[in-house]
Amino acid sequence: MQKAMTLREQLLKSEGCSYNAEISADFGDKVYSFTLSCSGKKDGDVIFSVVRPESISGISGVLSADGGKITFDEDRALAFPMLAEGELTPISGSWILYETLRSGYITSCGTDGDGVRVTLNDTYEDEALQVDVWLNGEDLPEKAEIFWEGRLVLSMMIMNFQIL
């Protein structure tokens, strides 16, 4: 538990963080995969840019508790269905990760191999998104999974996580 609390404290005291996330969104009949470059800010916003696949690279935006804004060229667009009964979009998973690390309800924490696995809820309400985060040997996120009503809906491999 201490490692999760230390990470939270570092994020709250810092100017934010940066990381890349390989995201897979599972809609049951189809899985969408893409890679984002993300920057979490002190105010809680996440600025992102799509890195892969090339067909949607360059799409960027800002995500916050109030919603999001996406910018794209005329020849590119994002069209993902909603996940978790409208609670989550594949792109907003990067904001959910950052927000739950900073303020989510920690429901459990324990060792998992050489690292630590932390389970958090995004709210204190009954229908919360569950976010499982694996911390590496440096106590930084390396993987996250988001569940809705016990079903895995979004997974992220996190690379180059740095606290700013």
Named regions from a protein language model:
Residues 50-52, 70-75, 145-149:
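Beta-turn initiation residues at beta-strand->coil junctions
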Residues 69-100:
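Acidic/charged, solvent-exposed loop-and-adjacent secondary-structure segments enriched in E/D, K/R, S/T
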Residues 1-36, 40:
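N-terminal leader/targeting segments and the immediate start of mature chains
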Residues 57-63, 80-84, 129, 152-157:
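A short, polar/proline- and glycine-enriched secondary-structure boundary/capping micro-motif
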Residues 27-31, 51-57, 125, 151-153:
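Solvent-exposed loop/turn segments connecting transmembrane beta-strands
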Residues 107-164:
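Gly/Pro-enriched, hydrophobic low-complexity segments
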Residues 36-40, 61-63, 133-135, 160-161:
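Extended lipid/amphipathic-ligand handling interfaces
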